[in-house]
Amino acid sequence: MSQFKEKVFAACAKKEALFDESLGRYALRSMLAGAYLTMSTAVGIIGADVIATGIPALSRFVFAFIFAIGLVFVLIFNGELATSNMMFLTSGAYYGKIKWSKMCTILLYCTFFNFVGALILAWFFNQSFSFQHLTDKSFLVTAVSTKLGKTDWMNFTEGITANMFVNIAILGYMLLKE
């Protein structure tokens, strides 16, 4: 059996067991994963704005670099992130290690609580001093404007590409953990 299959099967068993054992703990881990990524997104936005005053060309890199730290938090603190669950659980369902209906239930539950965790932390950041002073030149405003200016197809393909990078990073972490 390949190392990938071993990791997928182990991850599926662990996620399914946690989900069956305690929905509350699973929800909390999912909320924390959403919060970790919101935290790194917020810090990345401020970092991008700060660096843009001196070296504007680096602002997108700074944001991406700081955002990646949120993924590290998810991995280190065992958060339940919908993106990685899509990889593990879908692969597990494909290989028959988890039922398709159970996979969909866990994914919906995880995605919902990722969103709840992100919303709660985003609300707190919205109340902070740093986010009260965003202007139309701010990284956040220009990033959202750029995203809204793209076609649906471009956003779809960029989303898939971003998820591929996240899953490669998570799989790499899992394989290096041995």
Feature locations, PLM:
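Alpha-helical transmembrane segments and their helix-helix packing motifs
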Residues: M1-E178
